[in-house]
């Protein structure tokens, strides 16, 4: 069947993911291969000192992204999308979206980037004897309670961004287990919210007199492959303003960007892992057993089918690096040289590999925003050197590439060196890996492990959630998600692997020691520069 026939017969599957700077739609065929795509650029706003996206921006962004997909389908195949076999919605995890019983949002969406929840996260971590990160939805909820925010009494439903969009498209208040594990801890045995912690939380807030308990307002947890409702007539109109798309399409459980990244890199099996490196970064290692104790810098989440995952999440990754590359672009424009950004990135990234393995002593702190792993509530991007360091372009670029995964290294060193976690394969995806071989080599040095990158890595989470849509409608009886991906999607494709060199690993270790010692400078900058 051709792509055109797949679309016209309603066999195509749609995946849409809301990233922090881009909303992306991918249409796949029965072979699970992308056949069309659309996108929409967007940015978060800092309103009253909190990072947010407006409800209007969410819907206009979704509609523009879908319209862009329709345009691509029209241009490539000269047809319209009338029916679909399945739809999947995914988005940035965590954060706070609270609604009243009239479906009105009570306060502007508070995204994962907000680090104003320190008191709540610390109290809950102590209560649960479990690391509860600042950005988790339960931290945001409890912080609003601690702040005495009036809206809390009116909460009828609290969810994530993916859960919100799914609810509006289907009427179902559900969430995939992976995304739910970023709201509050999941019990891997029941694949549901940890019942003991739910009970403790309800006890903690009992004296405050709210008319709800936690399970009244949190979404129902679903596993990959479970029915999560169908596109309603109103939902179809909200997605496709042209009116071509028909209602009744089944949707898979909405997932978080961590889960879709695992799917897109075939890393849902135990002893596999993946690293997503873009505006923010995270590593996900699927564990064989629980860690021996909670660590503040390691979050425990799950795969979309409920296996336990150790996640190291960093708020900052490539934004500062991109800002420096942009500076070189401006210099090029000043000289009157035509600018091709792919060429600028390619030249600078590859030149970085000619620098010293330890960056010649140069250090970069890429903290556009706060970084909980290193204990910073706010960030100040900073480049530091001593007068006698080897200051040249290669070392300069290399230090910024190292910085993009430096915090990730600090967290993963605990997993590999202290918890002795074993991994057979780690796959990289995201913007850092666009320039062939460079980001891969840097990450391999950082975590002293071979890194694979697949050709499909650039498809990212939108393709991952489309695959979860495919799993909903195309999996065999009792076929696990790992088997479905292995047999029907990747079929032996493990991508291109780069192993770390001893020199790179030793150099990165020196760099990270300098980096840790210099954190006092970053802290001083946060405290003194406004």
Where do the model's predicted regions map?
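N-terminal glycine/serine-rich phosphate-binding loop of ATP-dependent small-molecule kinases
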Residues: 1-108, 122, 154, 215, ...
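Active-site core segments that coordinate phosphate-bearing ligands/cofactors
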Residues: 2-8, 14-15, 81, 119-175, ...
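Short beta-strand-loop/turn "lid" adjacent to the catalytic site in phosphate-handling enzymes
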Residues: 74-111, 131-133, 166-178, 182-187, ...
